[in-house]
Design a protein with these regions (language model features):
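Acidic, turn-prone loop/beta-hairpin segments
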Residues: 127, 221, 228-236, 739-765, ...
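Short cysteine-rich clusters marking metal-coordination/redox-active sites
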Residues: 220, 455, 526, 568-573, ...
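Core structural elements
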Residues: 173, 196, 509, 700-702, ...
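N-terminal mitochondrial targeting presequence
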Residues: 1-18
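Residues immediately within or flanking Cys/His clusters that coordinate Zn2+
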Residues: 217, 433, 452, 965-968, ...
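N-terminal, positively charged nucleic-acid-binding surface of large information/translation enzymes
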Residues: 14-304, 371-384, 388-403, 439-481, ...
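C-terminal low-complexity, glycine/proline- and small-hydrophobic-enriched intrinsically disordered tails
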Residues: 716, 845-994
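Structured ligand/cofactor/substrate-binding pocket environments in proteins
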Residues: 39, 98-111, 118, 126-127, ...
C-alpha cells in the first residue's frame, strides 16, 4: 500500500515523457556560453582578418579593372569607399579600457558601413616618439652615465622599447575583434612615415610658416623641454605664494605724476603690483597699465606719507590699504610718460610704464609686473616697445646666477647643495619675500589657490621660460582651419565650438623639443654664432634626400667630418662652419601628419591622380584630442594644402573612462579595469567574465559622448543581456536544424508571420537610424525590446507548439521556419557590427542548406541587411484584431481557478455576428496558446461572454473556460479524448512518421 503512490508518480512521469523523442525539440551545436580560446583562435580570424582582407581585395580589384580611368576611380572611391583614420595610440605599456572603448567604437562604425554596402579602409597606427619612451630608455642607465650616453644610443633603446610595446599592444588589440590587417599598420618611427613628415615640414618652410624666435614657452622642468599647450593639464587647486610689491617711480616721474594730479607734495611714489610668481621679479623690465582705467594716488600715513598708485576700483577692494588716504585720481594715459626702477637688481636703470590691453581691473592692482621672458602678454608688449627679454632660469628650473647681479648670488643659492635655487620651491619664494620685506618693497603677501598649468607627463607644475625655439606661424593658417571646420559634421555637436576655439586662440605652435627621440628639425647653426641659423626650402629638401639614403639616425651622429654631405653642393666651402641642430619635432606634429598615410594610399596604391575632397570619412578619438590630434591634424593638413579643407568629413569624440562611482580610472587610485579583466573576469573584484563580445557590448551600451563608467554592477547587467542573446540564437538555430529547408513566399504566410516580419522591418529601420546617429546604445535597447516583447513573449512562444509537435514537413512549420530564418538574418545583420564573434558563431552553426554555400559565404563577409517591403496594413490588421483578442484572453485567463495554470488547459469560444468570421481557428489557438478555439457565427451571446469592439466596427464575444478534454502526453494540450491518449494532431504526426 505504501508503494502505490510512488508507483503512480513514476507511471505518470513515464507517460509524460514517453513521446519526448518524437518531438522536434531544438538541436544545435551553438553553445550556451562563449569559449574564449575558440573565440580568439577561430572566430576572430574568421570575423575580422578574413572579412577585412576579402572586402578590401574586392575593392582593389574593382579599381584595377578601371585601368587608367582616373575619373572613374575617383568616383568609385568617393561613392563606395569608407575610410576611418586611426588616431595612433602611444606605444608604451599595456592597454587600458580607454583603448578598448576607442578601438571598438571605430570598429562598430566600420562594420556598420560594410553592412550598408561600403568597402572599408582602416589602417591601425602607433605613435612612437616622445618623452615617455625616451625616459624609459634613459632609466636603463645609471644617473652618472646619462651625460655620456649618445643620442644614437638613446634612440636605439627607445626604438627597441617602442617595438616591444607595439608587439604587446597588437596582441592585446587582437582580442577586441577589430576588423583590420594588423600586419600592415603605420608606425610613426618607420622610415617612410618620417620622410613624409619631413616633406610636410618642408612645405611649411616653403610657405614661410616656420620661424625661430627667442620667446616664452611652457617649459617642463622635470622633463627639461618645451611643451605645447596640448601637453598641459590644469590643476585647479595649485597653491602659490602671492605678493603685493612696490616699485618706486623715479624722482622725475613723481613730479610728472603730481603735476598731472594737480598736487604739490614732496614724497616718494611707488607702483603697487600683484604677482603669484615672486621668482620672476628679477626679470621685471616694465610695468603695464590700461589707459582706459582711472588710477588713485593713495597716501600711506603710517609710512612717512609716501604714495602708492592703484587702479581706482581695486583700491576699494584691497583690505590692507584701509589706512591709506585717497589724495587724487589720474587717467591711465597719465602713466604713459613715467618710469620706475627695480631695486632688486641693484641698478639705477629707469624702466618704462607701458599700456597693455591685457591689463584688467578684476583682480590685482591694475598695474601688471611685466617680465618678458616669463609671460606671453609680457613678451608681446615688450616686443612692440623693444624692451629686452631676459630669462635667468635654466632647463631644470634653477636660477642662472651668471645672468643675475652678484649681490643676489648668495641669496639664490641652496646652502646645503651649493646649487642655484629651484624657482618653484616654496623655500625660494620665502627668501625672496624676506628680501622684499627688508628692502621695504613688500606691502602684503598671502597664499593663493588657483588654476595652474602642469606637465601632463610628469604631473609637475611648469614654468614659462624664454628660450630660442622653432615655431609654426599660425596667423595665416588658422582662418582657413576654422573655415574648414564649418563643413565638418561633429558628433556630438559641441565638438565644433571646442575645436574652433582652440584653433582661434592659437597664433603659433612651438614645434621644437629638446629631446633625442623624435624626428629632427633639419636646421643648421653657425659654430661661432648659434643665433645664426640656416634652414631653407633647398636645405630641407637636401636633408630629406640624405636621410632617405643614410637613415634618420645619421642626423644624430654629431661629428663634423661629414657636414658637407648634409648641405647642398653650393654650401660645400662653408659647410664646416655649421653644425646640425639637436632639436626634434613635437610629437603632435608626428601624429598630426598621419593623413599622409591616406594620401599615399590614394596616390600610390589606388593610383589616383586626384585626391578625394576629404581624405577620411571619420576621425574618432577622446574629447581631449580637441587640444591634441584633431587640432594638429587640421593645422598641418590646411597648412600643407593651402586650402580650407580638413582631413576629415566627420569628427566624433568620446569621453573618459570612470569607475561605477563616477571617479576617473587611475592607477594611483587603484580603480583601473583592464580589458583583459573584463574579458576573463576577476573574482577578487567581483568582475564576471564577459568574453570578447561582452567587452564590445560594454562599450556599445554606453553613452560614449559623455564619460563612460564600468564596474561589477554594469558588467553583470551586460552578462545577463548576452545570455538573452545567446538563448534567442539557440532557439532560432535549434529550430532551423530539422527542416525541409523550404522557404515560403510572403503571400502564403499567416497574419502572425506577416506581423512579425513587419515588426522586424520596423526594428531594422530604427536600428539603421540609430547607427547613422552613432547611437549604439539605442540600437541595443531597440533590439532588446524587440527580442523581449515581439519574439520571446509573442512569436517564439506562439510558435513552439508547431515547431515541436507538428510534422517536419507541415506547412505551418515551414511558415514559421521561414520567419525564424528572417529573424536570424536580421538580428545577425543588426548586431553584427557590435557583436561580430557572436554573429560569426551563429553563422557557423546555421545549416548551409538555408542559404546555399555561395550565398552563405558572401553574407559571411558582407553581412548586408535583409530587405523588406511589408505594408503597414500587416501590422495594423493583426494589432487591431488578434492582439486585442490576446489581451482579452489574458484578462479572462487570470480570473480562472488556480488549478488552471497554463493556457493549454483552456478552450476559447469566439462568437461573431458576421458570417463567416475571417479568422482561422487553428491560427487563433496558436496566438492565444489555448488548447483550441471555437468560432461561432451568429446566435445570442451568453452572459458569460465578454464583448470586444474592434476598430473596424466588428463586435465579437469571447469566453475562456477550462477544457473538458484530457492532456495530450506529447504536446500537453488538453485536446485528448481520454487520459494518456494522444490528441488527433499528435497521433497523425506519429503515424505519418512511422
Amino acid at each position: 500500500m505504501l508503494n502505490r503512490p510512488r508507483c503512480w508518480v513514476i507511471r505518470r512521469f513515464a507517460s509524460q515523457h514517453a513521446y519526448q523523442k518524437t518531438l522536434n525539440l531544438p538541436q544545435t551545436k551553438f553553445a550556451n556560453r562563449s569559449n574564449l580560446q575558440r573565440t580568439v583562435n577561430e572566430l576572430i580570424p574568421e570575423s575580422c582578418d578574413k572579412i577585412y582582407k576579402s572586402q578590401l581585395q574586392e575593392f582593389l580589384s574593382k579599381i584595377e579593372e578601371l585601368g587608367d580611368d582616373s575619373n572613374a576611380k575617383l568616383k568609385l572611391v568617393e561613392e563606395n569607399l569608407f575610410v576611418l583614420q586611426d588616431g595612433p595610440p602611444y606605444a608604451n605599456g599595456d592597454l587600458h579600457y580607454g583603448h578598448a572603448l576607442n578601438k571598438i567604437l571605430k570598429d562598430i562604425i566600420n562594420r556598420y558601413q560594410l553592412s550598408q554596402g561600403k568597402y572599408i579602409f582602416y589602417k591601425p597606427g602607433w605613435d612612437c616618439h616622445g618623452l615617455p619612451i625616451e625616459m624609459k630608455a634613459l632609466k636603463q642607465f645609471n644617473p652618472d652615465q646619462l651625460g655620456k650616453v649618445s643620442p644614437v644610443k638613446i634612440r636605439a633603446m627607445a626604438s627597441n622599447h617602442a617595438r616591444k610595446a607595439i608587439k604587446l599592444q597588437k596582441e592585446q588589440f587582437g582580442k577586441f575583434a577589430i576588423m583590420t590587417d594588423w600586419d600592415k599598420p603605420y608606425v610613426t618611427m618607420e622610415s617612410e612615415y618620417e620622410i613624409n613628415q619631413l616633406r610636410v615640414f618642408l612645405k611649411l618652410v616653403s610657405r614661410g610658416l616656420i620661424k625661430r624666435q627667442n620667446k616664452p614657452v611652457y617649459w617642463g622642468t622635470e622633463t627639461r623641454t618645451a611643451l605645447a599647450e596640448g601637453e598641459l593639464e590644469y590643476n585647479e587647486n595649485h597653491k602659490s605664494k602671492a605678493a603685493y610689491v612696490e616699485f618706486p617711480l623715479t624722482k622725475d616721474s613723481c613730479s610728472k605724476l603730481f603735476e598731472s594730479a594737480n598736487i604739490t607734495p614732496v614724497a616718494d611714489v611707488s607702483l603697487l603690483i600683484w604677482t603669484t610668481t615672486p621668482w620672476t621679479l628679477f626679470s621685471n623690465r616694465a610695468i603695464c597699465f590700461n589707459e582706459k582705467y582711472e588710477y588713485q594716488l593713495l597716501r600711506d600715513n603710517n609710512n612717512g606719507g609716501n604714495y602708492v598708485v592703484v587702479e581706482s576700483n581695486l583700491a576699494e577692494k584691497l583690505e590692507f590699504l584701509i589706512n591709506y588716504q585717497k589724495v587724487a585720481a589720474v587717467s591711465g594715459s597719465a602713466l604713459s610718460r613715467l618710469q620706475y626702477t627695480n631695486p632688486l637688481l641693484g641698478d639705477r636703470v629707469e624702466r618704462p610704464l607701458l599700456h597693455g590691453d591685457h591689463v584688467t581691473n578684476s583682480a590685482g592692482t591694475g598695474l601688471v609686473h611685466t617680465a618678458p621672458g616669463h609671460g606671453f602678454d609680457d613678451y608681446n608688449v615688450a616686443h612692440n616697445h623693444k624692451v629686452e627679454v631676459v630669462s635667468p632660469v635654466d632647463a631644470a628650473g634653477r636660477f642662472k646666477l651668471e645672468e643675475l647681479p652678484p649681490h643676489l648670488h648668495e641669496l639664490l643659492t641652496e646652502h646645503q647643495t651649493g646649487l642655484p635655487r629651484l624657482v618653484l620651491e616654496p623655500s625660494t619664494a620665502k627668501v625672496i619675500l624676506d628680501m622684499l620685506q627688508k628692502m621695504g618693497m613688500l606691502c602684503s603677501s598671502h597664499d593663493y589657490t588657483h588654476s595652474y598649468p602642469y606637465d601632463w607627463r610628469s604631473k609637475k607644475p611648469v614654468i614659462i621660460r624664454a628660450t630660442p625655439q622653432w615655431f609654426a606661424d599660425l596667423h595665416d593658417v588658422k582662418g582657413d582651419a576654422i573655415e574648414s571646420l564649418e563643413k565638418v559634421k561633429f558628433y556630438p555637436d559641441r565638438g565644433n565650438a571646442r575645436l574652433s576655439s582652440f584653433i582661434k586662440n592659437r597664433n603659433e605652435w612651438c614645434i621644437s623639443r629638446q629631446r633625442s627621440w623624435g624626428v629632427p628639425i633639419p636646421a643648421f647653426y653657425k659654430k661661432d654664432d648659434p643665433d645664426v641659423t640656416l634652414m631653407t626650402e633647398e636645405t630641407v629638401a637636401h636633408v630629406i634626400q640624405v636621410i632617405r639614403e643614410k637613415g634618420i639616425d645619421a642626423w644624430f651622429k654629431f661629428d663634423d667630418s661629414n657636414m658637407a654631405d648634409w648641405l647642398p653642393p653650393r654650401y660645400k666651402n662653408e659647410a664646416n662652419s655649421y653644425y646640425r641642430g639637436k632639436d626634434t619635432m613635437d610629437v603632435w606634429f608626428d601624429s598630426g601628419t598621419a593623413w599622409n598615410e591616406l594620401k599615399d594610399f590614394y596616390l600610390k596604391e589606388l593610383k589616383l591622380k586626384q585626391l578625394p575632397t576629404y581624405l577620411a570619412d571619420v576621425y574618432l578619438e577622446g574629447s581631449d584630442q580637441h587640444r591634441g590630434w584633431f587640432q594638429s591634424s587640421t593645422l598641418t593638413r590646411v597648412a600643407y594644402s593651402g586650402k580650407p579643407v580638413a582631413p576629415f568629413k566627420t569628427l566624433i569624440t568620446h569621453g573618459f573612462t570612470l569607475d561605477e562611482n563616477g571617479i576617473k580610472m587611475s592607477k594611483s587610485i587603484g580603480n583601473v579595469i583592464s580589458p583583459d579583466a573584463i574579458i576573463q573576469g576577476d573574482k577578487t573584484r567581483g568582475l564576471p567574465a564577459l568574453g570578447v563580445d561582452g567587452l564590445r557590448y560594454l562599450v556599445a551600451q554606453s553613452n560614449f559622448t559623455a564619460d563612460v563608467a564600468a564596474g561589477p554592477v554594469i558588467m553583470n547587467h551586460v552578462a545577463e543581456a548576452l545570455k538573452k542573446f545567446r538563448l534567442a540564437f539557440r532557439f532560432l538555430l535549434g529550430n532551423l536544424q530539422k527542416a525541409t529547408f523550404q522557404k515560403i513566399s510572403y503571400d502564403q504566410l499567416r497574419p502572425i508571420d506577416k506581423y512579425t516580419l513587419y515588426k522586424l522591418q520596423e526594428l531594422q529601420i530604427t536600428a539603421r537610424t540609430f547607427y547613422n546617429e552613432n547611437n549604439f546604445s539605442k540600437v541595443l535597447t531597440a533590439v532588446q525590446y524587440h527580442m523581449s516583447n515581439d519574439l520571446s513573449a509573442l512569436y517564439f512562444d506562439i510558435s513552439k507548439d508547431s515547431l515541436y509537435s507538428d510534422a517536419l514537413d507541415s506547412f505551418k512549420r515551414q511558415q514559421i521556419q521561414t520567419v525564424l530564418l528572417q529573424i536570424l538574418l536580421s538580428y545577425t545583420a543588426i548586431i553584427g557590427p557590435i557583436l561580430p564573434t557572436l554573429v560569426q558563431e551563429v553563422w557557423n552553426a546555421l545549416p548551409l542548406k538555408w542559404l546555399g554555400e555561395e550565398e552563405h559565404q558572401k553574407l559571411t563577409v558582407f553581412r548586408t541587411w535583409p530587405h523588406y517591403d511589408i505594408p503597414e496594413s500587416a501590422k495594423n490588421s493583426f494589432a487591431n484584431c488578434e492582439l486585442r483578442l490576446l489581451d482579452e484572453f489574458q484578462r479572462q485567463f487570470d480570473t480562472l481557478e488556480k488549478s488552471i495554470t497554463k493556457p493549454v488547459q483552456t478552450v476559447t469560444r469566439i462568437r461573431s455576428s458576421e458570417c463567416p468570421l475571417p479568422y482561422n481557428e487553428d491560427e487563433l489557438a496558436d496566438i492565444l496558446r489555448t488548447a483550441r478555439v471555437e468560432i461561432i457565427s451568429g446566435g445570442v451571446p451568453e452572459e458569460t461572454e465578454t464583448e470586444i469592439s474592434l476598430p473596424n466596427g466588428t463586435k465579437l464575444h469571447m469566453l475562456v473556460r477550462p477544457s473538458e478534454l484530457s492532456k495530450c502526453p506529447r504536446c500537453w494540450k488538453h485536446n485528448s479524448s481520454q487520459e494518456d491518449t494522444l490528441c488527433s494532431r499528435c497521433n497523425d504526426t506519429i503515424h505519418n512518421k512511422a
